[in-house]
Regions:
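Transmembrane-lumen/periplasm boundary regions of multi-pass, lipid-linked membrane glycan transferases
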Residues: 40-46, 197-306
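Transmembrane-helix motifs of polytopic, lipid-linked glycan transferases
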Residues: 14, 99-124, 157, 309-314
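Transmembrane alpha-helical segments
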Residues: 19-24, 385-390, 400-426
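Loop-to-helix entry region of an early transmembrane alpha helix in multi-pass inner-membrane enzymes
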Residues: 77-84, 89-107, 141, 293-302
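Short acidic/glycine- and proline-prone juxtamembrane loop motifs at membrane-interface regions
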Residues: 137-150, 191
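Membrane-interface alpha helices of multi-pass inner-membrane proteins
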Residues: 174-191, 224-228
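Hydrophobic/aromatic-rich transmembrane helices and adjacent perimembrane loops
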Residues: 195, 338-393
């Protein structure tokens, strides 16, 4: 690799890291709580208040209710253990906990990238830093604190453990023992792991039996450790008559949707490496960017061409076993050529298994989030393709590197624009959190009454812990929340217009309401007597008046 290319790659790497870190923290600031996010937050805060970590994780099906004691849940305490730990570390401040969460994601990403450098070289490091660190799916995972998206970060660790196990070196025994435990932890965040990557690993070990038997004892140790990770769940289930487990079985029996209607979005394997989020379909992209900037459509199209080409080239080379270029693995830019090939073999093995298993086991095919466990491994097709271009198509390789520079700026801009309306909701939620949190701290344990629209009573119930939420009719303090109608964030009061799915036009905690838990729209602000009250706090959208009642 020449010195000029080295310098260019270092610049690309530096810019990718800077943009990734800045964007991750910037986007999380105003990330919004959706319906299932609020459910997860409520369940977490209940565990935080009682100092008891739930033995189950997130709800398998969004129920539409914030409180639902009969919801079917993911087995295992991993999700809420992590959630509560970060919340406790932040001393019960939701937005501080989100900063810790983003930091943890980035630390794991950087560990993965450092490992990439030592195993595959500078070119691989720079390319993956650009593709993964500045990636819409990664940004979504990082900013959605209350969803079980840490499977994305665990996918980085799984690739490291799996690759080190394959290297057959001094510490391969240790990594062999860690393979199943890391998947068990993933499974406590998202149960779809057991319909995809877990059976893929088992079948892979069978296919590579001659190698697997060498580490059988350590693999078995890993299975035993995985069992221990689920032991608390099993103990509670035995005590309550396998309540949650039976609900899971019944849910599976009741799920009668034809498989062709719930076919797994296995295309996520390719989409992960592209410019866009899978949930923003082509029509949305064309409608949005087609008017604003046709150039962006071209950039997005190029990202899909690169992703598809990487997939095809890798498939030909790994599955059809045809060397596109006899020197493709001969140079030092991609060291560990056998390791790269084996990782890609696992990648392609996953695809049919992730399709067949939900069909056979009557599982839900699910969306792209069901394949987060393979997020990190999805990018190894890009590495092989980049190596192919470097040797076979040097001019295209130069264009590829130029596109990387465009990519890292365009992706962050694209994510910002696509999520602009949602960020307005998130900002309103953050200001709502700020105002009720300030009231709870100001009351300092004294009973109080809140005069406002009912949405704030709901926010206080959701966000304040037991010590802070001392709302009572027998109160010593009264608070009035006023809304700044001149603020650019203020549009309409909460009414049926929110059902038009224009969330930026209404102050809501999430951008759609379920009739089951929609707060009333009653406004008690007019009942507050401003005499002898003082303005104690304001933010961009709200203000708080306080009045202490005479004893």
């Amino acid at each position: 690799m020449n010195k000029n290319l080295n310098k260019i790659l270092i610049v690309l790497l530096s810019l990718s890291i800077i943009i990734s870190v800045f964007s991750s923290f910037y986007f999380q600031k105003d990330a919004f709580l959706s319906n299932d996010n609020e459910q997860h937050f409520y369940d977490m805060r209940r565990g935080y208040d009682t100092k008891i970590i739930p033995h189950t994780g997130a709800r398998l099906v969004t129920s539409g209710k914030i409180i639902d004691e009969n919801a079917v849940r993911v087995p295992g305490a991993g999700f809420y253990a992590r959630f509560i730990s970060l919340y406790s570390l932040s001393n019960g401040n939701y937005y501080t906990a989100r900063i810790f969460d983003v930091s943890l994601y980035l630390i794991i990403l950087f560990i993965f990238l450092i490992w990439i450098y030592f195993r595959f070289g500078l070119m691989a490091l720079s390319i993956l830093a650009a593709f993964i660190g500045v990636n819409c799916v990664f940004f979504e995972a990082v900013t959605s604190f209350t969803n079980p998206n840490p499977v994305v970060s665990f996918s980085f660790l799984f690739v490291i453990f799996f690759a080190e196990y394959l290297r057959d070196c001094k510490y391969s025994k240790v990594f062999a023992a860690l393979l199943f435990p890391i998947l068990a932890i993933m499974g406590q965040f998202h149960f779809a792991v057991y319909y995809g990557i877990v059976p893929t690993l088992i079948i892979y070990l069978i296919i590579r039996f001659n190698y697997s038997k060498k580490y059988f004892a350590y693999l078995f140790l890993g299975v035993f450790i995985s069992f221990l990770l689920y032991l608390p769940y099993l103990i509670v289930e035995i005590q309550n008559g396998f309540e949650n487990s039976l609900r899971m079985i019944n849910l599976s029996k009741e799920y009668t949707v034809p498989f062709y209607k719930r076919f797994p979005q296995i295309s996520a394997q390719i989409v992960f490496t592209t410019f866009t989020l899978n949930k923003f379909d082509v029509k949305t992209i064309l409608n949005f960017w087609g008017i604003v900037s046709p150039l962006m459509i071209i950039i997005i199209a190029v990202s899909y061409i690169i992703a598809a080409s990487s997939f095809i080239v890798s498939f030909i080379c790994i599955i059809l076993k045809k060397d596109i270029n006899k020197d493709i693995f001969k140079e030092v830019k991609f060291k560990n050529d056998k390791l790269l090939k084996e990782l890609l073999f696992f990648y392609f093995l996953y695809i049919p298994i992730a399709i067949i298993c939900p069909m056979v086991l009557k599982g839900k095919g699910g969306g792209y989030v069901y394949h987060f466990s393979m997020f990190a491994m999805s990018f190894f097709t890009i590495l092989l393709f980049a190596n192919y271009l470097y040797y076979k198509k040097p001019k295209l390789f130069n264009y590829f590197i130029i596109f990387m520079f465009i990519h890292i700026f365009a992706v962050s801009w694209h994510y910002y624009k696509q999520n602009y309306k949602f960020s307005l909701i998130g900002k309103k939620q953050r200001l709502t959190y700020d105002i009720v949190k300030h009231i709870g701290l100001n009351a300092n344990g004294e009973s109080f009454k809140l005069y406002s629209r009912d949405i704030f009573d709901y926010a206080a119930w959701l966000f304040l812990n037991e010590k802070e939420n001392t709302i009572s009719e027998n109160h010593n303090i009264e608070y009035l929340i006023i809304e700044n109608t001149n603020s650019v964030l203020y549009r309409f009061n909460d009414d049926d217009r929110i059902k038009e799915r224009e969330p930026h036009k209404a102050l809501t905690l999430y951008y759609w309401y379920s009739p089951v838990n929609k707060p009333n729209t009653k406004d008690t602000s007019g009942d507050f007597d401003l005499n002898n009250s003082i303005l104690i706090y304001t933010n961009e959208l709200f203000g708080v008046y306080k009045k202490e009642l005479k004893q």
